[in-house]
């Protein structure tokens, strides 16, 4: 597989857009069967450059995320990125997750702070990371992964200080080692 930063660079140099898809882990075996049997084969006809797989609130789909990324890469030959969040993980646990990702041939990680499950407030895990920039730095020091970070053009929901502070947080992620920044296509589509 390829590093996503190299895919972006190649497309930019060629003056072409990068096409990627983001998938959520399945809730049922039937959903998984439909995804791999029908949905993904149909989407592959669009010629995506890569895909990413989300992590679930509070890391609730951790095992499934890595499994899906590995299967997309192995069965479809599509470069794929795993989302990874800080929430509810110590540094040691994150290290173990990264070991597993590397063992599965996963080369690209989207480093996120993460959202707590519905109804819960964000709280740093003791021995864990408080900010996505710390996770980015941990990944960079470890080596071996292409690193994506999240950007929030309309401002992060938890950043009360305003857009300028948001931009400073984004610059911090880049300075800590992020290779590229992803944003959502729509924040407010009304």
Annotate each language-model stretch with its function.
Residues 1-21, 28:
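N-terminal amphipathic alpha-helix/helix-capping segment at the start of soluble metabolic enzymes
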Residues 9-14, 40-47, 66-77, 98-106, ...:
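Acidic (Asp/Glu)-rich catalytic clusters
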Residues 10, 59-83, 127-150, 190:
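Alpha-helix-loop-beta-strand connector modules within alpha/beta enzyme cores
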Residues 17-25, 49-53, 80-84, 109-111, ...:
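Hydrophobic faces of well-ordered beta-strands that scaffold small-molecule active sites
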Residues 18-35, 80-92, 148-165:
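Active-site mouth loops of central-metabolism enzymes
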Residues 26-29, 48-67, 115-127, 178-190:
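Glycine-rich, proline-tolerant flexible connector loops at the mouths of alpha/beta enzymes
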Residues 34, 86-100, 126-130:
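Glycine-rich anion/phosphate-binding loops
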Residues 108-175, 180:
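Conserved anion-binding
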């Amino acid at each position: 597989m390829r590093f996503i930063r190299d895919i972006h660079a190649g497309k930019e140099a060629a003056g072409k857009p990068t096409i990627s898809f983001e998938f959520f882990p399945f809730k049922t075996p039937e959903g998984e069967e439909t995804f791999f049997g029908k949905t993904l084969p149909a989407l592959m006809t669009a010629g995506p450059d890569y895909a990413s797989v989300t992590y679930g609130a509070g890391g609730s789909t951790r095992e499934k995320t890595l499994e899906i990324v590995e299967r997309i890469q192995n069965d479809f030959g599509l470069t794929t990125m795993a989302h990874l969040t800080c929430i509810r993980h110590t540094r040691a646990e994150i290290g173990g997750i990264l070991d597993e990702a590397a063992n599965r041939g996963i080369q690209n990680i989207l480093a996120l702070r993460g959202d707590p499950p519905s109804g819960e407030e964000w709280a740093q895990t003791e021995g864990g990371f408080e900010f996505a920039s710390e996770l980015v730095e941990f990944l960079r020091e470890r080596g071996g992964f292409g690193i994506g970070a999240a950007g929030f053009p309309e401002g992060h929901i938890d950043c009360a200080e305003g857009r300028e502070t948001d931009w400073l947080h984004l610059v911090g992620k880049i300075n800590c080692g992020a290779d590229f920044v992803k944003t959502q296509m729509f924040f407010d589509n009304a």
